[in-house]
Amino acid sequence: MSGDLSRCLGKGSCPPGPVPEGVIRIYSMRFCPYSHRARLVLKAKGIRHEVININLKSKPDWYYTKHPFGQIPVLENSQCQLVYESVIACEYLDDVYPGRKLFPYDPYERARQKMLLELFCKVPPLSKECLIALRCGRDCTDLKVALRQELCNMEEILEYQNTTFFGGDCISMIDYLVWPWFERLDVYGLADCVNHTPMLRLWIASMKQDPAVCALHTDKSVFLGFLNLYFQNNPCAFDFGLCNPIIR
C-alpha cells in the first residue's frame, strides 16, 4: 500500500488500480496544507488508507477524472466514489468512519467550529502571499501586519473561551483544519507573527504533542529544500527528501 512518503505520479504515469475493499485512497502531495488537513483526520481516526501523491507541476492526464481542475486532496473509496475539497473531505471521513468524532455531535457546537473556520479564512492566502514576497525579495511589511491581525483575532477566540484548543479542552476538527498553516509559519519565515499571542503559542505547543500531528510532521530542512526547488519551478520539488520510493 502506498504511504505518505511514496513518490509523486506525474504526466505519462499509469493510473493506479482500483481501491481495495476496506481502504480509502487519498490523492495528495506531501507539502500541501490542504491535503495535510485530510491526512491529519485519517491519522487521528486510525482510518486504513493509501496515499497517492500527485506532481502538481506535471499532473497526470488521468488525474482530471478524479478532480475536474486537478486539485488535491481527493478521496476515493472502493465503490469509486470521489470526495474533494479539504473541509468536505474531512467532514466525510468523520461522518463515515467510526471512532472518536472530531466534529461535535451538538449542532450548535458543530456550527460554531465552522464559523471559527470562516474567521480563519484569510490566514492561508496571506501566508502564501507573504511567502512569495519573501522568496522574491519584495517588501512584505503590510502583508505581515495583516497576517498578525488575523492571528490576533484567533488569539482573542482562545482568550474568550479560556481553553487550550479551539474546540474546547481537547483537540477537535477545527484544530486539525487550521493546524497546517501554523506548522508552516516557521518554514515560511513568519514565526515572529505569533510573538505577541501567548494563548496561540500555548495552543501551538499543545498541538505539537498530538500523536497525529507528530506522525505527519515534516522536518524543516526537507520543507525548505522543497520550497527552494518549487520556486525554481523544478518538478522534482515534490519528491524532495526521498531517496527511494517507500511502500508500506
From Swiss-Prot:
Binding positions for glutathione per the UniProt entry: K59, I72, E85, S86
InterPro entries tied to this protein: Glutathione-S-Trfase_C-like (IPR010987), Glutathione-S-Trfase_C_sf (IPR036282), Glutathione_S-Trfase (IPR040079), Glutathione_S-Trfase_N (IPR004045), GST_omega (IPR005442), GST_Omega/HSP26 (IPR050983), Thioredoxin-like_sf (IPR036249)
CDD domains in the record: GST_C_Omega, GST_N_Omega
Active-site residues, as the UniProt record annotates them: C32 (nucleophile)
Domain GST C-terminal: 106-231
Catalytic activity, EC: 2.5.1.18, 1.8.5.1, 1.20.4.2
Keyword Oxidoreductase: yes
Keyword annotations of the record: Oxidoreductase, Transferase
Reactions catalysed, as given in the entry: RX + glutathione = an S-substituted glutathione + a halide anion + H(+); L-dehydroascorbate + 2 glutathione = glutathione disulfide + L-ascorbate; methylarsonate + 2 glutathione + H(+) = methylarsonous acid + glutathione disulfide + H2O
Pfam families for this protein: GST_N_2 (PF13409)
Domain (GST N-terminal): residue spans on this chain: 22-101
Biological process annotations from GO: cellular response to arsenic-containing substance; L-ascorbic acid metabolic process; xenobiotic metabolic process
GO cellular component: cytoplasm
Stored Gene3D superfamilies: 1.20.1050.10, Glutaredoxin (3.40.30.10)
One MF term in the entry's GO annotations: identical protein binding
Entry coiled-coil feature ranges: none
Top-level taxon of origin: Eukaryota
PROSITE patterns, sorted: GST_CTER, GST_NTER
Family as reported in the entry's similarity comment: Belongs to the GST superfamily. Omega family.
Functional description taken from the UniProt entry: Exhibits glutathione-dependent thiol transferase activity. Has high dehydroascorbate reductase activity and may contribute to the recycling of ascorbic acid. Participates in the biotransformation of inorganic arsenic and reduces monomethylarsonic acid (MMA).
Name of the protein: Glutathione S-transferase omega-2
Organism (species): Mus musculus (Mouse)
